[in-house]
Amino acid sequence: MAKIKMKTHRGAAKRFKVLKSGKVKRMKAYKSHLLTHKSSKRKRRLRKATYLEGASAKTIKRLLPYS
């Protein structure tokens, strides 16, 4: 019998990227709507990507077996 392939979690694949270094990159939340009352400084900070650490990075890597 053929070996069963692992499936990629599509929701995680759209939200996270595993880099060559092994870090998991993600974009920040609170940036899609209701932006008029948020300051320019805050919106500028939200544009930048950030990285997951520790247990949460390990969990996401498990959901993305081929990345």
Swiss-Prot record:
One Gene Ontology cellular component: cytosolic large ribosomal subunit
SUPFAM superfamilies the UniProt entry points to: L35p-like
GO MF entries: structural constituent of ribosome
Gene3D superfamilies found in the cross-reference section: 4.10.410.60
An example Gene Ontology biological process: translation
Keywords recorded for this protein, A-Z: Ribonucleoprotein, Ribosomal protein
Coiled-coil spans in chain: none
Pfam families, A to Z: Ribosomal_L35p (PF01632)
InterPro entries from the UniProt entry: Ribosomal_bL35, Ribosomal_bL35-like, Ribosomal_bL35_CS, Ribosomal_bL35_sf
Family from the record: Belongs to the bacterial ribosomal protein bL35 family.
NCBIfam families: rpmI_bact
Protein name per Swiss-Prot or TrEMBL: Large ribosomal subunit protein bL35
Organism of derivation: Caldanaerobacter subterraneus subsp. tengcongensis (strain DSM 15242 / JCM 11007 / NBRC 100824 / MB4) (Thermoanaerobacter tengcongensis)
Gene field: rpmI
